[in-house]
Amino acid sequence: MSKLFWAMLAFISRLPVPSRWSQGLDFEQYSRGIVMFPFIGLILGGVSGLIFILLQPWCGIPLAALFCILALALLTGGFHLDGLADTCDGIFSARRRERMLEIMRDSRLGTHGGLALIFVLLAKILVVSELALRGTPMLAALAAACAAGRGSAVLLMYRHRYAREEGLGNVFIGKVSGRQTCITLGLAIIIATVLLPGMQGLAAMVVTCAAIFILGQLLKRTLGGQTGDTLGAAIELGELIFLLALL
């Protein structure tokens, strides 16, 4: 299990993980690592939250929010943001399904992808700033949001098909069991409710799961399935929706 955790941490983040810590683990086994996603989100969000706390007394809330969101993007290597941009470029091209998938494979950034990145990053910075002004504990909020975003992404894996013949997302999409889905969502809910007081964390998690489930159904109808890009989009939007639900 520890090998699986380190493999997942290296897979969806840019944190340095020695290769020997996950040595001997086959790529086909990665689907079992979905239950680790909320914990990885907890770590990434915790680092981002610490950066906010350290910088806020020095440069104020707006700049601290900017740098903590920038840190979060750097910690993931922009992996999920790239998926968000590619998904929006494809979906909003208003082409046939096959052409949408081709556009999503294109490494060049299109207008819709650029607008999506600007909107999501700016929205995160503004929401984090507003939450801090309202006295929300930002370490807890960011850690819970990142756990929720990664945990809710399982809703685009369970009982979904892969829209392409090959790709990284094929490791998870359609390969996750109902038990793994329940465990992943359960862990994300526990993290959110423990970190945030009262029913705030639970309510935000319910809103996030509902929104990501609807997103998954819309993407399934449009693309005929999911891809690694749509998983990245779900994670980014899940984080934002969770933070918005805390307002």
From Swiss-Prot:
GO terms for cellular component: plasma membrane. GO terms for molecular function: adenosylcobinamide-GDP ribazoletransferase activity; cobalamin 5'-phosphate synthase activity. It comes from the Bacteria. The chain crosses the membrane at residues 34-54, 59-79, 113-133, 138-158, 171-193, 197-219. Its EC number is 2.7.8.26. Its main location: membrane. It catalyses: alpha-ribazole + adenosylcob(III)inamide-GDP = adenosylcob(III)alamin + GMP + H(+); alpha-ribazole 5'-phosphate + adenosylcob(III)inamide-GDP = adenosylcob(III)alamin 5'-phosphate + GMP + H(+). This is Adenosylcobinamide-GDP ribazoletransferase. It comes from Salmonella newport (strain SL254).
